[in-house]
Amino acid sequence: MLQDELYMVRCLELARLGTGSVSPNPRVGCVIVKDGKIIGEGWHQKYGGPHAEVNAVNSVADTSQLEGSVVYVNLEPCAHVGKTPPCADLLIKHKVGKVVIANTDTNSLVSGKGIEKLKAAGIEVTQNVLAQLGRELNKRFFTFHEKQRPYIILKWAQTLDGFVARSNYESKWISNEQSRQVVHKWRSEEDAV
């Protein structure tokens, strides 16, 4: 595994920590590296709260180390003012040397604008590092912005003879414990059931 991929794996681990708290925003993690050492980490923790890049920058003990550092983030830094200021501007302000991204943000408010802003400021940008893993992590976000519909999971349990309930409507589990655990996990990840 390449060095960029190793740090991106860590970004994705951090991003997962936002599960259940950031929707409809995507799950995003950020790792800041200087001279081969991680100097800062962060993730988007709560909808409406600071983005991963802000939390990572704030975790750096000596912000002078940010100049020339490499920032790993699984989704393109935003370039618009929403509930928070643009993350691309923050990275430019701190004169980072390079930004490594898993996925371009397909939200029409961003959609490559963050990358353009970084490049225009002279920051090197590497894209598509572990892009498939990034898309899988944020498949709900990408489905919403690319297909203008929610991500859909169909869960169905039936007996071997095709029924979904007993003839007297008495309650009885059809699915097994393992299946119920998977469904419980799905429900914790979705915005509606």
Where are these regions (language model features)?
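A short, polar/charged loop-to-alpha-helix boundary motif
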Residues: 45-58, 175-181
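A short, small-residue-rich loop immediately preceding and capping a beta-strand
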Residues: 66-75, 99
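Local cysteine-cluster metal-coordination motifs and their immediate loop/turn environment
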Residues: 43, 50-54, 71-90
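A structural motif shared across PLP-dependent enzymes of the aminotransferase-like
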Residues: 20-23, 27, 48-50
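Acidic, glycine-enriched active-site microenvironments
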Residues: 2, 23-28, 67-69
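Zinc-dependent deaminase
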Residues: 1-21, 38, 63, 82-193
